[in-house]
Swiss-Prot record:
This is Ribose-phosphate pyrophosphokinase. The gene is prs. Its EC number is 2.7.6.1. Mg(2+) 1 binds at residue 137. GO terms for cellular component: cytoplasm; ribose phosphate diphosphokinase complex. It is found in: Cytoplasm. It catalyses: D-ribose 5-phosphate + ATP = 5-phospho-alpha-D-ribose 1-diphosphate + AMP + H(+). It comes from Staphylococcus saprophyticus subsp. saprophyticus (strain ATCC 15305 / DSM 20229 / NCIMB 8711 / NCTC 7292 / S-41).
Length: 321
């Protein structure tokens, strides 16, 4: 817990249904109780939200990842923003540990929507004033918003685990990006761990199907750490792990900020060359979806610090590294 000085302040933290354990942990770090609100369903599936305490003049922080079921959690968030606006909250801040639709950030083919931008429009129209986000799939999504975005990174949390809680020797380790787009992320982890990096040249013939083609970098005899922002069906990560093993990697670890883990992900990871999967709790994982060799790290402390700094009108940039 950081402190208790916010118990009777104008700082209010609310949780919807997206990740209640994470929200509770954040509130515990800040030193306040979660705000009282009810989220119910009508018999026809419509969402009803009721804020059960006064928030007039308060700085409200709504914690809600828009993870599976994406549309339901997104609608909960939009309705809660509207409720806070109509209840005269001074500032409505949304804390989105996982931003759904982030992979639809551009037109890859003709006549496709840019859904990440549409979601940004919906959030701003509903009345949000600021967003605290964690590892957006494409950092340029920040430009889809006109309101301030505090974009936090999960890499330091992952790095501290490998640095302090494993017996990996940095001199015999290599950080691997599963594609060219993740090189910046891999470089950041490698800089913290003081290791070299490698890149996997990947060809994706159709969605959710990946084929590993080539590895650029020294792999043989090293412990490889593959890092990505999202692991969804785990096709990319498991093929990458096998390719690294085939190139002589000693052990293969995989890590990500957002464990979507849909479809065959659990089975693929458990039957792969991956020794351990390291993830954060940005998305609430039930046991049915969690591979046996999974280590879950908490981002609650990071989010709590960001919330306090925003509330105190202090710089958040110190948390970016």
């Amino acid at each position: 817990m950081l402190n208790n000085e916010y118990k009777n302040s104008a700082l209010k933290i609310f949780s919807l249904k997206g990740n209640e354990p994470l929200a509770q942990e954040v509130a515990d770090h800040v030193g306040i109780e979660l705000g009282k609100c009810s989220v119910k369903r009508f018999s026809d599936g419509e969402i009803q939200i009721n804020i059960e305490e006064s928030i007039r003049g308060c700085d409200v922080f709504i914690i809600q990842p828009t993870s599976n079921p994406v549309n339901l959690h997104l609608m909960e968030l939009l309705i809660m923003i509207d409720a806070c606006r109509r209840a005269s909250a001074a500032n409505i801040n949304i804390v989105v540990p996982y931003y759904g639709y982030a992979r639809q950030d551009r037109k890859a083919r003709s006549r496709e929507p840019i859904t990440a931008k549409l979601v940004a429009n919906l959030i701003e129209t509903a009345g949000a004033d600021r967003m605290i986000a964690l590892d957006l799939h494409a950092p340029q999504i920040q430009g889809f918003f006109d309101m301030p975005i505090d974009h936090l990174m999960g890499v330091p949390i992952l790095a501290q685990y490998f640095k302090n809680e494993t017996d990996i020797d940095p001199e015999e380790c290599v950080v691997v990006s599963p594609d060219h787009g993740g090189v910046t992320r891999a470089r950041k982890l490698a800089d913290i761990l003081k290791t070299p990096i490698a890149i996997i040249d990947k060809r994706r013939p159709k969605p959710n199907v990946a084929e590993v083609m080539n590895i650029v970098g020294e792999i043989e005899g090293r412990t490889a750490i593959i890092i990505d922002d999202i692991i969804d069906t785990a096709g990319t990560i498991t093929l990458a792990a096998q390719a690294l093993k085939d190139k002589g990697a000693k052990d293969v670890y995989a890590c990500c900020t957002h464990p979507v883990l849909s479809g065959p992900a659990k089975e693929r990871i458990e039957n792969s060359a991956i020794k351990e999967l390291v993830v954060t709790n940005s998305i609430q994982l039930d046991e049915k979806r969690k591979p046996e060799n999974t280590k879950e790290l908490s981002v609650a402390g990071l989010l709590a610090q960001a919330i306090i700094r925003v509330y105190e009108r202090e710089s958040v940039s110190v948390l970016f590294d």
